[in-house]
Design a protein with these regions (language model features):
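PLD/PLD-like phosphodiesterase catalytic module centered on the HKD motif
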Residues: 2-92, 110-203, 207, 211-216, ...
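A Trp-anchored, charged/polar loop motif used as the substrate-binding/catalytic surface
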Residues: 318-334, 349-354
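Short acidic, glycine-rich surface-loop motifs adjacent to enzyme active sites
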Residues: 95, 100-102
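Short coil/turn segments at secondary-structure boundaries
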Residues: 249-253, 299, 498-503
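Active-site cores of enzymes that catalyze phosphoryl transfer or operate on phosphate-rich substrates
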Residues: 46-75, 80, 257-328
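Non-catalytic, alpha-helical, charged scaffold/linker segments
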Residues: 233, 243-267
């Protein structure tokens, strides 16, 4: 009897297990089918994104050199303080080379200079080169200036280990240079590239090297951990140095330095023979602005980086790559295939060129956002003279763009935001200096394309200044996510603007501002 019961229970147990297994198999099959379907959809989406990105890269490959790297080789920094600490740490640990290209180094940046000094003392094999703009770097001379501060490093370590160069635009010479005030003469062209190379890494940014950029002036900062990219920009840097004046310390000069044109430089010098200088500069720079004749690809990588330069004052014919790349991207976004894309465009100074403005309005995006500094976050806020009128001038240009958005019937798709964090020159007040573009493809959640660098996308950037940028094109989900996060956090202090906001009394622009804009354009400069 007991045996029968046991056998009955065993049979029942087997039947239950069999039924459960059948049930589980059914669920597994459903899950497997669902997973396969999801994977297939993901694959189709991935293939679609890849083919769309190929439209961009196919054109970019005709324009610029390309470097295929791992997405992990790109680090995105968030704050001025993080940028400063990262830069100092990398300089302290430098073994072979440090090259720093910037508009200027603050004349009181003794802590930063001490960081370079300690690195030179710690490593006798280290060589340091610094490139700034002549006009900005010597503005305060014979009082303490950027140039005199850097000359102290040469005095201490010698010209074999420390080099300081000052680029002078060929557009400002003779009588014009003699009569224009120092604060205004920078409108005729500057060395504006921000290249911070340390050994085999480079930080690309729009930030200069002074206290506000280290504390309360918001910008963007990407670290590229790539020897080929760092070497490329090193070659560009070296070439511009050979087109620039060399600083030497001097006890005889009240300024503490002299700027001379070495015989080893590209000849002639810009202040003596501007046209001859441009001709010689074009010869040495054109190869750097051209794509290689033979393309090498690395199929295993998912991220490409295109170095883009704008060297218009030095190139005849002008073979600069930044403006053609940017306008090419915007034209592509305006085609039916890319309807429904999303983009964010930002610049500290709201003064994009008419061509860029028109192309943005032709993109028909699912959403487009322009972010610019509010007048109270503009570095010129409170300045004296014409420069003090610039925040109001940029405000006027922002209003005109928003009017154009409305006229194009895109008010529901394109937004203009102004960034403000307190008021500049008051406790807790920040300025906004970030620039770039992020492009998110249709049906995607995060950007696949991003442009970062020194350019402000203005008439000045494309006709008078030297600019250097990198364009990132990626299929890597993690890098896309990080670019998306950067795009969002830069808008933490940004507020959407309306036409009514610009009509408020405090935002109205007087005749004197319009007159100042006209004068600056008339005499040959650019905002």
């Amino acid at each position: 009897m007991l045996t029968r019961r046991v056998l009955h229970c065993v049979r029942a147990s087997r039947q239950v297990r069999s039924l459960k297994q059948i049930s589980r198999n059914g669920i597994l099959q459903q899950r497997s089918a669902s997973t396969a379907s999801g994977q297939a959809a993901s694959t189709v989406s991935s293939q679609s994104s890849a083919s769309q990105l190929a439209v961009f890269t196919g054109e970019l490959d005709k324009l610029s050199p390309r470097f295929d790297i791992s997405a992990d080789s790109i680090q995105i920094l968030k704050s001025p303080a993080e940028f400063y600490e990262t830069l100092k740490t990398k300089i302290r640990n430098a073994k072979r080379r440090v090259y720093l290209s910037t508009l200027y180094i603050g004349k009181s940046e003794h802590e930063f200079i001490d960081t370079i000094r300690q690195a030179l003392k710690s490593n006798p094999d280290l060589q340091v080169s610094l490139l700034t703009d002549y006009l900005r770097g010597t503005r305060e001379a014979p009082n303490p200036s950027c140039a005199s501060l850097l000359a102290s490093l040469i005095q201490e370590f010698g010209p074999d280990r420390v080099e300081v160069r000052l680029y002078h635009t060929p557009n400002l010479t003779g009588a014009r240079k003699a009569i224009l005030p120092k604060r205004i003469n920078e409108g005729w062209g500057l060395q504006h590239m921000k290249l911070y190379g340390i050994d085999d890494e480079i930080i690309m940014s729009g930030a200069n090297l002074s206290d506000d950029y280290f504390t309360n002036r918001q910008d963007r900062y990407h670290v590229f951990k790539s020897k080929p990219i760092t070497d490329y920009f090193s070659e560009l840097y070296r070439t511009i140095c050979d087109l620039s004046y060399r600083v030497s310390p001097s006890d005889k000069e009240a300024s503490g330095f002299i700027a001379e044109w070495p015989l080893q430089n590209v000849q002639p010098e810009p202040l003596k023979d501007p046209s001859g200088y441009i001709k010689a500069a074009s010869k040495v720079l054109l190869p750097l602005a051209s794509p290689p004749s033979v393309k090498t690809t690395q199929p295993e990588t998912d991220t490409s980086v295109y170095p883009l330069v704008q060297l218009t004052p030095l190139l005849k014919p002008d073979k600069s790559t930044e403006l053609p790349a940017l306008t090419g991207i915007l034209r592509t976004l305006g085609t039916p295939e890319f309807a429904g894309s999303k983009w964010t465009f930002t610049a500290g100074y709201f003064n994009m060129t008419p061509e860029v403005r028109k192309l943005l309005l032709k993109t028909k995006p699912a959403s487009g956002t322009v972010v610019a500094a509010s007048p109270w976050a503009n570095g010129f806020y409170g300045s004296k003279g014409v420069s003090g009128m610039l925040p109001a001038a940029y405000s006027l240009l922002g209003r005109r763009f928003l009017d154009a958005v409305s006229k194009a019937g895109l008010s529901n798709q394109i937004a203009v935001k102004e960034w403000r964090r307190g008021t500049v020159n008051t406790p807790g007040g920040w300025t906004y200096h970030a620039k770039g573009i992020w492009v998110t493809l249709p049906q995607e959640q995060n950007p696949s394309i991003s442009l970062i660098g020194s350019s402000n996308y203005t008439k000045r950037s494309y006709s008078l200044d030297l600019e250097a940028n990198t364009l990132i094109v990626t299929r890597n989900a993690d890098l896309q996510r990080r670019l998306g996060a950067e795009q969002k956090w830069l808008q933490d202090y940004a507020t959407p603007m309306t036409q009514d906001d610009y009509a408020k009394t405090e935002r109205r622009v007087g005749l004197h501002v319009r007159l100042a804009m006209w004068i600056v354009t008339l005499v040959g400069g650019a905002l």
